[in-house]
Amino acid sequence: MANHAAKPLALTLGEPAGIGPDITIAGWLRRRELNLPAFYLLGDEALIARRAKTLDKTLGKALGAEIRIASVSAHEAAAAFTEALPVVATGERATAEPGQPDASSAPAALASIRQAVADVRAGRAGAVVTNPIAKSVLYRAGFRHPGHTEFLAELAAKDGRVPQPVMMLWSPRLAVVPVTIHVSLRDALSQLTSELIVSTVRIVATELKSRFGIARPRIAVSGLNPHAGEDGSLGHEEQTIIAPALKTLRNDGIDARGPLPADTMFHEAARSSYDCAVCMYHDQALIPIKTVAFDDAVNVTLGLPFIRTSPDHGTAFDIAGTGKANPASLIAALELASRMAAAKT
């Protein structure tokens, strides 16, 4: 991939018992073949060494390559990357076995995220890339955030002000953003306001320009109700909430189109007419992208003072340690983060 970031990417450990270590190792093994940007893993070197030993019989043998691990500092990571997977210690041990999540390893997962943010804000890394976490495991250890996105926003706070995080799912074929994120459908309906739509779309438009190089972003905005409410016969939110938001956005000079019926927004011809689809709730946005780009979609958090991407899948405990985990989404996340960092203005 061209236009790599000048600095290595900080990759978090994710859930230690999940496939995060697996796809990290699998991605590193393909670094030369795919010309991947340099990255380093923040976590417990002993855990990664154990997983590497397990995977050497499958991944290493299949690719005809030796899995090598190097304990380094963030400053040494880029130089080490060619010959070994750089691992930067966080001071937290992780003892969980593949497929057997243990709340005692939660501090290691959280320390990895905190250190990645600290590294990118200190200029040691070009972007943050996060491996999948298991929120249910973190909750047992006292974690109180709905997800990665909200935790990262808190870590990005400055002078007590927490930025509004916007979750984008991106692929070469489709990019989507849900206005409401990790809440129940009932709560999503109560949270939906014109102000939230306006602030979300403004962030999307700004970052499509600055980090994706799109000079005049075309943003398609969905309705909430079936057939976008059919002029109020199937719901009023399009008229009372979404349309006023679109008027404000257009007055700002933003190309925001809608409200559009969600059931006809995502076929191939429709997708070619916009750069990003903004939807009203989580599943309205995620079902289409996981249908058209299940293996290579990337989770991108917009609205933060740093770049963050993540593979668009979970921990897959059932295949952890087997060598069966597909690293395609992580590879896409690394490549996109590097491209965004190189293009950042």
UniProtKB/Swiss-Prot annotation:
Keyword terms: Cobalt, Cytoplasm, Magnesium, Metal-binding, NAD, NADP, Oxidoreductase, Pyridoxine biosynthesis, Zinc
Named cofactor requirement(s): Zn(2+); Mg(2+); Co(2+)
One biological process term in Gene Ontology: pyridoxine biosynthetic process
Gene3D superfamilies, per the entry: Isopropylmalate Dehydrogenase
Lineage: superkingdom: Bacteria
Cofactor binding: number and manner: Binds 1 divalent metal cation per subunit. Can use ions such as Zn(2+), Mg(2+) or Co(2+).
Gene Ontology MF terms in the entry: 4-hydroxythreonine-4-phosphate dehydrogenase activity; cobalt ion binding; magnesium ion binding; NAD binding; zinc ion binding
Catalysed conversion reaction: 4-(phosphooxy)-L-threonine + NAD(+) = 3-amino-2-oxopropyl phosphate + CO2 + NADH
Broad EC category: oxidoreductase
Keyword Oxidoreductase: yes
Subunit composition and interactions: Homodimer.
Protein's job: Catalyzes the NAD(P)-dependent oxidation of 4-(phosphooxy)-L-threonine (HTP) into 2-amino-3-oxo-4-(phosphooxy)butyric acid which spontaneously decarboxylates to form 3-amino-2-oxopropyl phosphate (AHAP).
Additional information: The active site is located at the dimer interface.
Name of the protein this chain belongs to: 4-hydroxythreonine-4-phosphate dehydrogenase
Species: Bradyrhizobium diazoefficiens (strain JCM 10833 / BCRC 13528 / IAM 13628 / NBRC 14792 / USDA 110)
